[in-house]
């Protein structure tokens, strides 16, 4: 899966998809820096799952 820029609702949707029932903790500064300003992978998104 290629890395991509994810911002706003797209970022939340991707986290829901990756984390599923585990849920995720939302730290806007960290994840926006990592996934919106720069492209990030699904593996990087998993770091935000509970």
UniProtKB/Swiss-Prot annotation:
InterPro entries: Insulin (IPR004825), Insulin-like (IPR016179), Insulin-like_sf (IPR036438), Insulin_CS (IPR022353), Insulin_family (IPR022352). GO terms for molecular function: hormone activity. Heterodimer of a B chain and an A chain linked by two disulfide bonds. It comes from Thunnus orientalis (North Pacific bluefin tuna). Belongs to the insulin family. PANTHER family: INSULIN, INSULIN/INSULIN GROWTH FACTOR. This is Insulin-1. Insulin decreases blood glucose concentration. It increases cell permeability to monosaccharides, amino acids and fatty acids. It accelerates glycolysis, the pentose phosphate cycle, and glycogen synthesis in liver. One of its GO terms (biological process) is glucose metabolic process. Keywords: Carbohydrate metabolism, Disulfide bond, Glucose metabolism, Hormone, Secreted.
């Amino acid at each position: 899966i290629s890395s991509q820029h994810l911002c706003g609702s797209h970022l939340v949707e991707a986290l829901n998809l990756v984390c599923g029932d585990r849920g995720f903790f939302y730290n806007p500064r960290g994840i926006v820096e990592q996934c919106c300003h720069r492209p990030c992978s699904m593996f990087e998104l998993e770091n935000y799952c509970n």
